[in-house]
């Protein structure tokens, strides 16, 4: 630093002189030769390449939310519903900005950037009076603007302008690909991320629009070309107009029309809709492959995955297994290497719920461990969620699950995790398996890394975690999990509330464990918090409501935690609303409350508990005995005790 500062202070001539003299004295390098400067070819970069390069230099911060959320405690989503709401709200802002740009286009006609950025300018509006030509149509098709392309095509048709067969073919491909429905724009990432879950719920069936523009365009193209056949066949196959797609394929074969490999792939994918039994499906699949061979068509990865998809629909496990073992080596001999989608199909073929146990995932992981993958097939994004499901439900193997997770976090493989639904399934199975197979301390380390910024446990998984904690006797973690349940909005799940209370009541703190020293007080806080939240939920007509068992456990925890005054309030609520509350507290809860009343020298509360027990047909002798022996009762209290249990009991 000192030398650099001194050099900057010297005059330029002195610097040159000093460097040349020192260089002449010390250098041993050969004099530089004039070499031609070669400018490397331009590398195509995406808008986020620089950000990705910077992000790769630092490890992931598990305590921070996803970058799409505001890093602010009040704006970080803490439930799955909030994650979706916050992300879609941000997306709606983009939509609002786009709407303003289109509605008030006169404000956005200027172009500040050089070169101009097309997305910043309002899009062209086409009406019935627009002057259009083939160039306009070609440009819209190249940009994927389906709605405007169809409008311009109709305008050209109405005005009688000729349209070249090549342009009709391009429009046919666009219409067939989208089934003449406007797709979600690429910039709406979050909408596509969350939409997949809704699409999955829709019933799988034919959605192809019969007699629509695609078929009209196809009929206008004369003579029929292989491209026109291919476009319509693929479109019908994609939207499950299966019979007509297969009929068109047969028609093309009869007319000696040479189709391409991807067209055959699309028909192989729908074989399960064309035939019923496994044998019939496998035979049709082989017939299509033989036809490809006769036409000298080389299969590709799409062919392999289409065949495996067909095999995965076989109900007969033995036939499916034999077919998969026959197909995979043949494709490898042809130089077709499987993708993650291929391995996904192998998993669902071999690891069936009602089939024999298969360890095929071990061979798959040995083959692909440590590799980085790129998307090659739409089903590639199904592999990780399915692999983790196999590790948990089929094999129950923690070591395999950790290998899958290591593969997911290799390079950019996380890009292949899929949509929000698949990511949630992946971590649901991963956490459930870890909580069943690891010690509580090790599991909580993984829990801290993943929850809540990467994954928020569903109520079912939270119940699994509570069960594992109960089995391992790690009751000290229950108050913390209750805090998470409050944040994750699980407090309206009655089964979870009862489970938390049961664990705290049934597992008394270990006096020799420092970790459980504060557990009685923490348990009392949990119980009081739960009581107040359920009371609030009842006022708001939420689904959860008090039960006798729940209130009895809350009463017990408050007593054990030294919160006697709050316990009396809870018991007053029990006594006042006993006709509304289903069930009753346990006798042990009443006994502990009476013992606490004895310690607090409150005979009135103890007698209230005894009266409640008598009215609800409990065996009240134990309670009466504790009250009689624990207090020096005055005449009023003694007469009430006699009226409840009788004088004969006191004479014993």
From Swiss-Prot:
Q: Does the keyword Mitochondrion apply?
A: yes
Spell out the disulfide connections. Answer: none
At the top level of its lineage, which domain of life is listed?
Eukaryota
Does the keyword Mitochondrion belong to this entry? yes
A Pfam family found in this protein is Rib_mS39_PPR
For this entry, the transit peptide stretch runs 1-37
| GO biological process terms on file | mitochondrial translation; regulation of translation
PPR repeats (start-end): 129-163, 225-259, 260-299, 300-338, 547-581
One GO cellular component assignment for this chain's record is: ribosome
Q: What happens when the gene is disrupted?
A: Larval lethal; arrested development at 1st or 2nd instar and failure to molt into 3rd instar.
Where it sits in the cell: the answer is: Mitochondrion
Q: Which residues form a coiled coil?
A: none
Span of the signal peptide: none
Q: What task does this protein carry out?
A: Mitochondrial protein that may have a role in mitochondrial translation. Essential for larval development.
Q: Which PANTHER family does this one have?
A: PENTATRICOPEPTIDE REPEAT DOMAIN-CONTAINING PROTEIN 3, SMALL RIBOSOMAL SUBUNIT PROTEIN MS39
**What family does the database annotate?**
Belongs to the mitochondrion-specific ribosomal protein mS39 family.
Q: Know the name of this protein?
A: Small ribosomal subunit protein mS39
Gene of this entry:
Ptcd3
